[in-house]
Regions:
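An alpha-helical support segment within catalytic cores of ATP-dependent transferases
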Residues: 48-51, 65-107, 117
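Short, conserved phosphate-binding/catalytic loop or strand-edge motifs used
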Residues: 56-67
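Active-site activation/catalytic loop segments of kinase-like enzymes and analogous catalytic loops
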Residues: 136-170, 184-189
Length: 189
């Protein structure tokens, strides 16, 4: 904040990170493995971090299905599809949600927020505004959902990302089983 005689001005200083957004490069398995590793390392670094805003009602937290359900009236065209994925989540994940790993996650590793270097390695991630205390498996699921949405044959790519993440930040078998449902819910938000 810069105080002037007749005004108060807010200034934000940013560091420019050179590279290309993931959306602008053709992903391969090795590249997405490194993205998964990066996300896993980020989540490991966030262990023990606390913030009062991390536990809030938040539409972008796909694990908060009550928020998604409250918004169904705004999704008339896709309502039945969204309800289908909500039911899958309830049937396959919600019943054992207390067994799933939780922590503060970045929660927005989409292809517009991941910056790659010229060698196909992740350089950085931006946009920390969607951070939330949620299911750990949601971290790779968010990125995997955007990869799957933009690729004709995504399975090898998203498997590589999940492998990179889980080798860095271990996920339980139940966590791993929840990933596909969390991917689908993220696309419903």
């Amino acid at each position: 904040v810069i105080e002037c005689p007749n005004s108060r001005n807010y200034v934000r200083l940013l560091t420019y990170i050179e590279g290309d957004f993931l959306k602008d490069v053709k992903p391969n398995s090795a590249m997405l493995f490194s993205v998964g590793e990066f996300l896993g390392n980020l989540d490991k670094a966030l262990i023990g971090f606390e913030h009062k805003s991390s536990s809030r009602e938040f539409i972008w937290d796909a694990a908060q299905i009550h928020v998604l359900i409250s918004q169904l009236d705004h999704s008339k065209n896709d309502r039945s599809l969204i309800e289908y994925f909500i039911e899958l989540y309830k049937d396959n994940v919600f019943g054992h949600i207390n067994e799933l790993s939780k922590g503060i996650i970045h929660n927005d590793g989409n292809d517009h927020n991941v910056i790659m270097d010229q060698n196909g390695k992740i350089k950085s991630i931006i946009d920390f505004g969607d951070m939330v205390f949620s299911l750990q498996a949601l971290e790779p699921a968010v990125c995997m959902a955007y990869i799957a949405m933009n690729e004709e044959a995504p399975f090898e790519l998203i498997a590589s990302l999940l492998k990179g993440y889980s080798l860095t930040k271990a996920l339980s078998e139940k966590d791993l089983e929840s990933v596909v449902y969390l991917m689908c819910l993220r696309m419903c938000v």
